[in-house]
């Protein structure tokens, strides 16, 4: 079952089409990475999911209900942090949460529960003005968690964080998903961070979804543009042998470089050269498959 279903979502600012009919499915219980370069349409999509922008075309369904028809009921089950958290700098974490607790009509004990979840229980009398960026982001998540949502929507929550802050944020989100069953939809342009965190991924570029599915499927997908690099005792002969096999190798700074389509091709090239009496001194597959996949997907224009 999908927690979020988006169909043929189109959005325009003036004459510019920001979203060109995207489809988005977030499985319930997943950590879904919404991945794409800056300006791809990620924040616009999340704002539409939260009803912060008026939908122009398409359908949005959350928890099996239409956002158009059940907006208030749906948003009671959703927590969100879009861009930077909105907090009162002169108030403490507890005081910021107390204001919103009254709005949500949560029991008083919920404040300490969410502060413990995000590791801010010991901030005591410190005002939000004194918080580090990482602490402010965690306070923003505490605010989003206050009313015990089933879905957490986060827009670039690791932006500006130092390496330690990024690790803390990653572990927090994993814990919320694992121990509390919260479905998490997180946007980012940081491929390496998304790879370590999510179960499912959608790649958006120029307002169009380029890929959607389990992260494991994206990793298995064979991109174009991967290379095989090698050195032999006779590169001239190696070039001729490879050409006879239909492999277009080229000389590049003392090495031979040729395209590859699979890991099996690496072994085949090695066997071919050795069978012709060549000595292969070095053989390496170039390119990060996941990185190459991502770059290939986002560079395609509609």
Q: What does each of the following model-derived ranges do?
A:
Residues 90, 231, 259, 283-284:
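Active-site-adjacent beta-strand anchor residues
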Residues 65-68, 105, 209, 233, ...:
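Short, surface-exposed acidic/glycine-rich loop or hinge patches that mediate macromolecular interfaces
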Residues 170-260:
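ABC transporter nucleotide-binding domain
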Residues 3-6, 11-186, 191-205, 211:
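ABC transporter nucleotide-binding domains
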Residues 261-302:
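C-terminal coupling/interaction segments
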């Amino acid at each position: 079952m999908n927690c979020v279903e988006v169909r043929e979502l189109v959005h325009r600012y003036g004459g510019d089409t920001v979203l060109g009919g995207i489809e988005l499915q977030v499985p319930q219980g997943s950590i879904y990475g919404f991945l794409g370069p800056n300006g791809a349409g990620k924040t616009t999509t999340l704002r539409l999911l939260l009803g912060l922008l008026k939908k122009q075309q398409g359908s949005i369904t959350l928890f099996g209900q239409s956002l158009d028809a059940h907006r208030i009921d749906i948003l009671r089950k959703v927590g969100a942090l879009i861009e930077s958290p909105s907090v009162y700098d002169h108030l403490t974490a507890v005081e910021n949460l107390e204001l919103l607790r009254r709005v949500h009509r949560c029991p008083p004990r919920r404040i300490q529960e969410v502060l413990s979840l995000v590791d801010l229980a010991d901030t005591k009398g410190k005002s939000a003005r004194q918080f580090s960026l990482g602490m402010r982001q965690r306070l923003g998540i505490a605010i989003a968690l206050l009313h015990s949502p089933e879905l957490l929507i986060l827009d670039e929550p690791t932006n500006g964080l130092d390496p330690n802050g990024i690790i803390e944020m990653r572990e927090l989100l994993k814990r919320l998903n694992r121990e509390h069953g919260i479905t998490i939809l997180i946007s980012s342009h940081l491929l390496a961070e998304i790879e370590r965190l999510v179960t499912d991924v959608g790649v958006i570029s120029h307002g169009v979804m380029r890929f959607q599915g389990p992260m494991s499927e994206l990793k298995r997908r064979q991109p174009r543009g991967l290379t095989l690099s090698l050195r032999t005792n006779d590169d001239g002969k190696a070039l001729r042998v490879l050409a006879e096999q239909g492999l277009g190798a080229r000389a590049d700074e003392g090495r031979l470089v040729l395209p590859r389509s699979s890991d099996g091709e690496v072994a085949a090239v090695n066997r071919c050269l050795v069978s012709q009496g060549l000595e292969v001194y070095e053989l390496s597959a170039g390119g990060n498959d996941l990185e190459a996949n991502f770059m290939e997907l986002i560079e395609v224009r509609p």
